[in-house]
Amino acid sequence: MGFLNKLFDDNAREVKKYQKKIAAINDLEPEIKALSDEQLRAKTDEFKQRLENGESLDSLLPEAFAVVREASWRVNGQRHYDVQLIGGMVLHDGRIAEMRTGEGKTLVATLPSYLNALTGRGVHIVTVNDYLARRDSEMMGRIHQFLGLSVGLIVHGLNYAQRRESYAADITYGTNNEFGFDYLRDNMVTRPDGLVQRELHYAIVDEVDSILIDEARTPLIISGEADKPTELYNRIAMIIPRLKPEEDYNVNEKDRVVTLTEQGVSRVETMLSVENLFDDLHTELAHHVNQGLKAHALFKLDRDYVVKDGQVIIVDEFTGRLMFGRRYSEGLHQAIEAKEKVKIEKESQTLATITFQNYFRMFEKLAGMTGTAMTEEPEFKKIYKLDVVEIPTNMPMIREDLPDVVYRTEEGKFKAVVEEIIERHKKGQPVLVGTVSVEKSERLSSMLERRGIPHQVLNAKFHEKEAEIIAGAGLKGMVTIATNMAGRGTDIILGEEVAPLGGLHIIGTERHESRRIDNQLRGRAGRQGDPGSSQFFLSLEDDLMRLFGADNITGMMDKLGMDDSVPITSKMISRSVETAQRRVENRNFEIRKHVLDYDDVMNLQREVIYAQRRQVLMGGNIQESIADMLEKVVRETVDMFGAQSPYPEEWDLNSFLEYVENVFLPNHDITAEQVGSMEKEEIVEMLLERAQAHYKTRETAFGEEIMREIERAVMLQVVDKKWMDHLDAMDMLREGIGLRAYGQKNPLVEYRREAYDMFQGMISSIQEDTIRYIMRVTPQVTEQKPEEPQHVRTNRDEEQPARPVHNEGPQIGRNDPCPCGSGKKYKKCCGADS
């Protein structure tokens, strides 16, 4: 308890600090109120001028906040409460503001976004879906536009020109997916005029827990079609149903793993007519079997995905929303398509990928807001260096949170939920019921239909009406069934006569793995001092209770001889449930941390490649880079053949000269006798001199301008192809690295070491291929058209080998971070030997 007391003391102290500035803002109110619309708008230019003259944003804050507050009142009829001003200051300081549902987070964001947009460097306001981004940009954008700032919107379906214009605005509203994908696309363009994003200056993330924690494990992936047949998926889908659970395979639901038993392996081998499923010849077949098993045993229709218009659409486990465009990777999505007998889409190859963790950590300043962040504060601090400040509510919270009730079976629980709904419906009290899946919401809906209770259902199948359904959930007599946190971001306003009936009543039908998600459901009631209540109905058959320790409760119920219809409520049960949730939360945090440890390795490599690619794209000194590459390739070629013997006459000179011709000196007239009579360093000098002369001849023939254009196009094309292959190779490395633990080796250390070697190999391969093409390519004169996006899709998938290593390493500064991911400087780590 001492820790909790300290936590609340610290929070109160932080809030008190901000409250001192509130007085200054409030004191300015009469003066600002007296300004005309034109004078109020002119304040924006005045602030910009004062910034140029050396004033800081912090010193402008009281006046800027007072201006936004007044503009909001004039434009939208909304005046920021004092607690909302505190929220705005917390966001300006690059922290997370925890504000209860209904406290007006969207309005809060207008304060720091206006202040930080005065720098002219852009502000991103990030929301979880297109509807909220569009709504907020329209409603809150009016305030900014009134004050002379431009507002942009980034949602699905915009063309290149619209995106570029939106990013150029002072304040840009959009979704996390669109911002992330645009960043990846920007690192795939081949001309500078194809770029849409500006620098990553300041981001305010709404529902920050959903984006930075719940979605942290899901990378954003842009992929293109891979040339792989799909027949094998159907073949596997036909044999999996013939296998018997426990006899042929074991399912570990807790870790989401399925494994074949020995009997299962031999049955699969018989059905597929192969001798050994796990030998090197059948690696791909074994992978298909594994994915087929997962598709049938772990992934359930109407829980993990739905089938809509002949397509398998993933359901977001946290919000219950359909995730259009997202696909499971590594052939799993195709395995599910085969299971559901719908058209199997071709597999894809990853072109670019990044996690939300690494995308948002690139912003110079990051802030967030949510109704529930305190339970995850350690993770926000450790991974994003973000503090959480709990903002006091404007009105006291009077919602009544009733103790959980637990039933032995799920059937008993749902019957009790229906009776509770009927009881409250009789007196006209609105009820919002939260379920964990589409399947459970439909089950409850049919039970209510049988009892003649009118109700509305909001799940992944009815997402189009989400905001409309949620907004009406507070009307008298309304019964709404919603999956998880669907409708988050839309306020539930109580209808007339509802407050005396007790306000909105929330029923949770299952505890989520995370206490935070449960708190979000409870938080739908009791907004802005409204009355309300909440209660969770649980059963021992719920996933959380079944998988994470309800044995002691089951034993107790057995001893008491309790039947299905009798609930049990006790503090011990509530404690057991909370202990199980803490256990799962810690486990999930470790998984996310583990993912990040591996992704950090890839992230450093991505930063090196993207930085060098951007340099080439923007017309950096390409000629100098080519000259360096040429020398490296010549030296590496001589070193590679020279490894056989220090004496050139003992080398395989015919192969050597063939390689030289193939890579950097086409149509040369050098003979084996010439090379055999020279010293190693003389060979390097002679080859380099001739290669440079050949390069110069080509440059003179084409002209410098065309030569630079050729070099730029070749380098970008080669880098993109090699990076794409490298991503696949890294995926394969990652997939198999866990097995190193059996050899008493640390998989992460091994991954870093091998990833670094592969990165070195890729850089060497980029240099060699770039030189090969530049020494051969003939320019074709074509009309230049505006850059159009490539035919790619955004989601996720897989496979390709890496090139062996023989080079001096990438062009990394000695003081740069080492791409192996150790966190040390290059000169102190992998560069120590060079």
Curated annotation (Swiss-Prot):
It is found in: Cell membrane; Cytoplasm. Residues 780-834 are annotated as: Disordered. SMART domains: SecA_DEAD (SM00957), SecA_PP_bind (SM00958). It comes from the Bacteria. One of its GO terms (molecular function) is protein-exporting ATPase activity. It is a peripheral membrane protein. CDD domains: DEXDc_SecA, SF2_C_secA. Belongs to the SecA family. Monomer and homodimer. Part of the essential Sec protein translocation apparatus which comprises SecA, SecYEG and auxiliary proteins SecDF. Other proteins may also be involved. This is Protein translocase subunit SecA. The lineage of its organism: Bacteria, Bacillati, Bacillota, Clostridia, Eubacteriales.
